[in-house]
């Protein structure tokens, strides 16, 4: 996918850079593979704001994407690649030989007409194929990696992301994540071959505030420009620096403060993403 820039006929067009989606399917999604999605606007069931700076945006239909890939040893053909408003990656519509259809995350270099297969045994190392980590060659680039067998892929699902399988140890696979973290995952967990599509997503420039509003994002207001009643950094005469270490609106430390508390899974992290890069 290439990037697309525009003639500056308006001030916002001057900065606008988007992903050229000309090669994607332009019709509606398969109705049987969609669900309704109501906009929450950052509110909970009491109507109170639980996530700030959300609301509005275009109505969306949720596409049911198969992250589990547990339809083993049934070959599928990629019908088309589609845009999905609910995620940064593209999705692929797959029709299996038994007639069933499913959406999967589209990896890079997957095109309409390609064959994909998922198995609990070793299969070809081709983009879109899925198999347990214990059968994937060391050094492979993978995505949509499970953390628990059967739970469905959780790691590397965003546009352009991938994980590298760097080794094996006592039934566990050693993975290197984009963040630099190295962690252990059980060898029976499934993973798909290749990196996730739409790697140019990180290079887009919205060009105007309205594009964020179309996505349901409202202006993100800094604490230092608020009043003291609204934020610990608020108030003061003229511009201030906040006068204290950065905190959330509720007074908890933020900006670099470690928040991970799941000590039971610490043993699976071989190298923290916070360790100094060598």
Swiss-Prot record:
SUPFAM superfamilies: Nucleic acid-binding proteins, Translation proteins SH3-like domain
Residues in the signal sequence: none
Compositionally biased tracts (Basic residues): 210-221
Transmembrane segments: none
Record InterPro entries: NA-bd_OB-fold, Rib_uL2_dom2, Ribosomal_uL2, Ribosomal_uL2_bac/org-type, Ribosomal_uL2_C, Ribosomal_uL2_CS, Ribosomal_uL2_dom3, Ribosomal_uL2_RNA-bd_dom
Region (Disordered): 201-278
Keyword match Oxidoreductase: no
GO molecular function: rRNA binding; structural constituent of ribosome; transferase activity
GO biological process, one term: cytoplasmic translation
Its job: One of the primary rRNA binding proteins. Required for association of the 30S and 50S subunits to form the 70S ribosome, for tRNA binding and peptide bond formation. It has been suggested to have peptidyltransferase activity; this is somewhat controversial. Makes several contacts with the 16S rRNA in the 70S ribosome.
Record-stated family: Belongs to the universal ribosomal protein uL2 family.
Protein name per UniProt: Large ribosomal subunit protein uL2
Organism: Agrobacterium fabrum (strain C58 / ATCC 33970) (Agrobacterium tumefaciens (strain C58))
This protein's encoding gene: rplB
């Amino acid at each position: 996918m290439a990037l697309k820039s525009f003639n500056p006929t308006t001030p916002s067009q001057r900065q606008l850079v988007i992903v050229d989606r000309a090669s994607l399917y332009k019709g509606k999604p398969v109705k049987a593979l969609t669900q309704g999605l109501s906009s929450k606007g950052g509110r909970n069931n009491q109507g109170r704001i639980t996530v700030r700076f959300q609301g509005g945006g275009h109505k969306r239909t949720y596409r049911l994407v198969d992250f589990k890939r547990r339809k083993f040893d049934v070959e599928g053909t990629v019908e088309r690649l589609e845009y999905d408003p609910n995620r940064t990656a593209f999705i692929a519509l797959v029709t299996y030989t038994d007639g069933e259809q499913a959406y999967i995350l589209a990896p890079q270099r997957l095109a309409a007409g390609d064959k994909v297969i998922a198995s609990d045994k070793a299969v070809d190392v081709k983009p879109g194929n899925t198999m347990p980590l214990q059968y994937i060659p060391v050094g492979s680039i993978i995505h949509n990696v499970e953390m628990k067998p059967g739970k469905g892929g959780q790691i590397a699902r965003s546009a352009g992301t991938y994980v590298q399988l760097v080794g094996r140890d006592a039934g566990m696979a050693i993975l290197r994540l984009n963040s630099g973290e190295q962690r252990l995952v059980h060898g029976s967990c499934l993973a798909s071959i290749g990196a996730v599509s739409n790697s140019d997503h990180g290079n887009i420039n919205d060009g105007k505030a309205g594009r964020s509003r179309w996505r349901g994002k409202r202006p993100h207001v800094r604490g230092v420009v608020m009043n003291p009643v609204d934020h610990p950094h608020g108030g003061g005469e003229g511009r201030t620096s906040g006068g204290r270490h950065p905190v959330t609106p509720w007074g908890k430390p933020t900006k670099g403060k470690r928040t991970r508390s799941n000590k039971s899974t610490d043993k699976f992290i071989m190298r923290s993403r916070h360790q100094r890069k060598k």
